[in-house]
Swiss-Prot record:
Its cofactor is NADP(+). Transmembrane segments: none annotated. Binds 1 NADP(+) per subunit. Homopentamer. Contains a large N-terminal NADP-binding domain, and a smaller C-terminal substrate-binding domain. GO terms for biological process: ADP-L-glycero-beta-D-manno-heptose biosynthetic process; carbohydrate metabolic process. InterPro entries: Epimerase_deHydtase, Heptose_epim, NAD(P)-bd_dom_sf. It is an enzyme of class 5 (isomerase). The keyword NADP applies. This is ADP-L-glycero-D-manno-heptose-6-epimerase. It comes from Haemophilus influenzae (strain 86-028NP). It holds the Pfam family Epimerase. One of its GO terms (molecular function) is NADP binding.
Length: 308
């Protein structure tokens, strides 16, 4: 069996899809379906069982057995960079992850987890080293602290433990994320409503490493298949502009004039204007597949979003 936490969420459901594509259906999805709309991410996927996240962690803490587990992909977390309830974030993202990590270490179960580029903060260098890490929000801090925890236990680990610092992920199955969904998702919705696509004023100076979710899932699967341990950036290695995203959306629809709107006050000083993954460490594992450009990935995503 394979366990995917956050399996009804954005990246988790794409990992389930990638596992299905390998012929694996013996998958336990762990999630919180209080937001019932997330069920839609699982409708076309094959899984063996579902468990609520609180029931699951209670079983983990109790030491319950789930049979033979080939791997755990831990994608479940509060991923809202705008959430400022630190007690909730640390419990949900940090303590939960530690419990699951130790369960896997004790049983030598390969453990792959979602970290984030939010661990870096305001830097021009995105390399997996302490000197470049300085999160700007409590979400980023929760991910940073778990990475630090993993770094300390890695030398003693007898089974793979692998964290991925996701950059700006976009693509299918993010519909439930609301305001935290990708720019491409929001621009598509604006055009469908007959509006012009809108970018924040000043965004011509913002550049992000936008990575397609299919590529993210592929790296997770490859690292599992190859027994990789460590903490790795997962982006494309190239920063592209928000304008490039908008251009790809407009080109797909064949209509729309890009407009600018004021930059929100509450995001100032808490917003990464530039991200670009240094992929040196990931490439050193032997992973050599190319990543989709914004033009390629957004076009594929638009086709998925607008399928009949």
């Amino acid at each position: 069996m394979i366990i995917v936490t956050g399996g009804a969420g954005f990246i988790g459901s794409n990992i389930v899809k990638a596992l299905n594509d390998l012929g694996r259906k013996d998958i336990l999805v762990v999630d919180n379906l209080k937001d019932g709309t997330k069920f839609a991410n699982l409708v076309d996927l094959d899984i063996a069982d579902y468990c609520d996240k609180e029931d699951f962690i209670a079983s983990i803490i109790a030491g319950d057995e789930f049979g033979d587990i080939d791997a755990v992909f831990h994608e479940g977390a509060c991923s809202a960079t705008t959430e400022w309830d630190g007690k909730y974030i640390m419990h949900n993202n940090y303590e939960y992850s530690k419990e699951l990590l130790h369960y896997c270490l004790d049983r030598e179960i390969p453990f792959f987890y979602a970290s984030s580029a939010a661990t870096y903060g305001d830097t021009k260098v995105f390399r997996e080293e302490r000197e470049f890490e300085g999160p700007l929000n409590v979400y980023g801090y929760s991910k940073f602290l778990f990475d630090q925890y993993v770094r300390n236990i890695l030398p003693e680990a007898k089974s793979p433990v692998c964290g991925f610092r996701y950059f700006n992920v976009y693509g299918p199955r993010e519909n439930h994320k609301g305001s935290m969904a990708s720019v491409a998702f929001h621009l598509n919705n604006q055009i469908l409503k007959g509006e012009n696509p809108k970018l924040f004023a000043g965004s011509e100076g913002f550049r992000r490493d936008f990575v397609y979710v299919g590529d993210v899932a592929a790296v997770n699967i490859w690292c599992w298949q190859n027994g990789i341990s460590g903490i790795y950036n997962l982006g494309t290695g190239n920063a592209e502009s928000f304008r490039a995203v908008a251009d790809a959306v407009v080109k797909f629809h064949g209509k729309g004039e890009i407009e600018t709107i004021p930059f929100p006050e509450h995001l100032k000083s808490r917003y990464q204007e530039y991200t670009q993954a240094d992929l040196t460490k990931l490439r050193s594992t032997g992973y050599d597949k190319p990543f989709k450009t914004v033009a390629e990935g957004v076009t594929e995503y638009m086709a998925w979003l607008n399928r009949k």
